[in-house]
């Protein structure tokens, strides 16, 4: 494993937790400016991964599933959105009610404090960053390191779920984020189209910001 890949794995695995740790120093009710800065740092993780791939590993962007979109990209994104947003809740909603309701309610209460435009920013950028870290980079590099694509994908999916524990709690992370991660991973392995995953993931979050989270104030 090269130093560049080791750095990329560190960014993908520890970066989100580092941003959460920074947010703790901002207090319980940070200003919108502080939250914008924190989100910019979070987005910087994806930029760092792209720079590592291009200039550190000297690999093409399609080594993490990032390539020019086609009509198939849009159809894949649409199908993934339907599966994740409309069908998956039949599985996850009962699990959340049984194991992750407290975490869900606490997380939604925090999001409800935010203005609508900032929720759009969080949703639109959040899906892009998470897909870059967990699907594009971690799946591909862990698969290469282990020599088994299924193992790399499994480890990346577990990492995705665990990354949500500090904010949403263990119950919600296992009941909702883990199944969502499995679906996103299956689609990535099937089509290996990172942009399709980004579109579906970000769209789902943005819509959920207004259909699940109540209006501020």
Q: Which residues does each PLM region occupy?
A:
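N-terminal hydrophobic targeting signals that begin at the initiator methionine
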Residues: 1-2, 217
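Alpha-helical transmembrane segments in multi-pass membrane proteins
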Residues: 2-56
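Residue-level signature of transmembrane alpha-helical entry/exit and packing/kink sites
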Residues: 4-9, 35-39, 69, 73-77, ...
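Transmembrane helix-loop-helix hairpins at the membrane interface
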Residues: 17-18, 86, 111-217
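Alpha-helical transmembrane segments and their lipid-water interface positions
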Residues: 49, 92-93, 208
């Amino acid at each position: 494993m090269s130093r560049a890949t080791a750095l990329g794995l560190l960014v993908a695995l520890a970066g989100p937790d580092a941003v959460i740790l920074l947010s703790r120093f901002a207090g319980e009710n940070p200003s919108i400016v502080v939250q914008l800065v924190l989100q910019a740092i979070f987005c910087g993780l994806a930029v760092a991964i792209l720079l590592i791939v291009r200039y550190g590993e000297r690999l093409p962007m399609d080594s993490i599933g990032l390539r020019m979109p086609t009509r198939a990209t849009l159809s894949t994104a649409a199908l993934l959105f339907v599966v994740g947003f409309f069908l998956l809740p039949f599985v996850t909603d009962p699990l959340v009610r049984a194991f992750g309701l407290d975490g869900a309610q606490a997380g939604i209460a925090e999001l409800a404090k935010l203005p609508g435009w900032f929720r759009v920013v969080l949703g639109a950028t959040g899906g892009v960053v998470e897909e870059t870290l967990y699907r594009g980079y971690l799946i591909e590099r862990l698969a290469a390191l282990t020599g088994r694509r299924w193992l790399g994908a499994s480890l990346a999916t577990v990492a995705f779920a665990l990354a949500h524990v500090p904010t949403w709690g263990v119950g919600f992370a296992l009941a909702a984020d883990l199944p969502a991660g499995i679906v996103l991973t299956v689609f990535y392995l099937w089509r290996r189209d990172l942009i399709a995953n980004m579109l579906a993931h970000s769209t789902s979050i943005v819509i959920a910001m207004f259909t699940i989270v109540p209006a501020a104030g």
